[in-house]
Amino acid sequence: MRPFIHDDFLLHTDAARDLYHSFAKAEPIFDYHCHLPQQQILENHQFADLAEIWLGGDHYKWRAMRANGVKERFCTGAATPREKFDAWVGAVPHTLRNPLYHWSHLELARYFGIFDLINQKSADKIWREANEKLATMRVHDILAANKVAVICTTDDPADSLEQHEKIKKLGIKTRVYPTFRPDKALNVGSPAAYNAWLEKLAGAAKTKIASFDDFLSALKKRHDDFHAIGGRLSDHGMENCYAEPCTATEAQAIFDAARAGRAASVADQAKFASFMMLEFGRWDAKKGWTKQLHLGALRNNNTRLLATLGPDTGFDSIGDFPQTRALSRYLDTLDSTDELPRTVLYNLNPADNYAFATMIGNFQDGSVPGKMQFGSGWWFLDQKEAMEWQMNALSNQGLLSRFVGMLTDSRSFLSYTRHEYFRRTLCNLIGAEMERGEIPNDRELVGPMVRRICFANAREYFRLELDPSFRG
């Protein structure tokens, strides 16, 4: 009997199978957005057991466990690694039709050569065999086995870049770059947290922040530092874009008030964010960076568990914020002075798919293929159905052939199977259309496009320095 995970998993036509095995499968991975801990890359971390590498930091799995009636101590609490593993294994059969069922079986198959269905009967065997394999596996082995050419971590301007500097000297083929994510620079509505962050920023920039000009200079210095170490991407996670009129004088007054401990009003927070986002856009454009906008998350919905566990532990959801008008004004303001950088737009609400897919077309300027990108399905949308929605919207309103493809957006080193999952979904979608006669059943036409979406488009678009073996 064929195992659940097999060579042709998710590939339902001959054309899909040919596209995947001949054009997609062997391509390297360009992971241009993730949340991997660079400390574990630096130290070439060896994971103690399957629970650490499989469950640690994975809020997708924690949400499913809670939904299955699992107590918090088995998710993020003090239960033993084996107890946490057993709690997850008990939950997996209940995740049928959830992408976690696919992902979890792919992870065991690809990293550990385990093809058993995950359940309580197979738990002892999985635990034993995976831990035996982990004893011979370190982070660098995982990166090499998956042919990971690039990792772009997510970094605050106040974070030290020391680990990135050390990783650069390791000599591994995977290049690791920081991504400039200045979300906390906008937080003038919470003066205590804001001022504590400003002190950290001042330390990272090796300067004092006594004025608004000092603040801008410190941020600009950190932007320069990220560039010097090879970073070429920025990222912003916001409920929606901001495009309110705001002069430098108004922004300075809002900053000064927050520095003095007075919280900005909601209206002033929007004005300040609007001013700063334009500054960030201009800096990115001047240096030839790519800006990423992650829009639409409603975060930290459970205040009780936020207070107990902190953010990014599985209590966020899709928001229904108005997106298009402010986004249009923001992009247009930068474009009107020829200061719009390459931009990747990600929406979390699938209702915005066609709005975002059409928005990028307004600002393609012919300077580079696919300057404006509609990003791959993000977070709650990085599963088969929603990835198809995103690719269909992009295909119908733009050029799928110029798409920069998949990213992990993950905190787990096992998540490189997400690229395989995406590639299989891509090939199945296109292969079905080839066999229905909706596009030519011509592998010499379609195959190279698939290959480019899997790696080369991202390599050419982001223009990061790669190891010679990945330069093509």
Swiss-Prot record:
Pathway: Carbohydrate metabolism; pentose and glucuronate interconversion. GO terms for biological process: D-galacturonate catabolic process; D-glucuronate catabolic process. It comes from Opitutus terrae (strain DSM 11246 / JCM 15787 / PB90-1). Keywords: Isomerase. PANTHER family: URONATE ISOMERASE. Its EC number is 5.3.1.12. One of its GO terms (molecular function) is glucuronate isomerase activity. The keyword Isomerase applies. Belongs to the metallo-dependent hydrolases superfamily. Uronate isomerase family. Signal peptide: none annotated. This is Uronate isomerase. It catalyses: D-glucuronate = D-fructuronate; aldehydo-D-galacturonate = keto-D-tagaturonate. The keyword Isomerase applies.
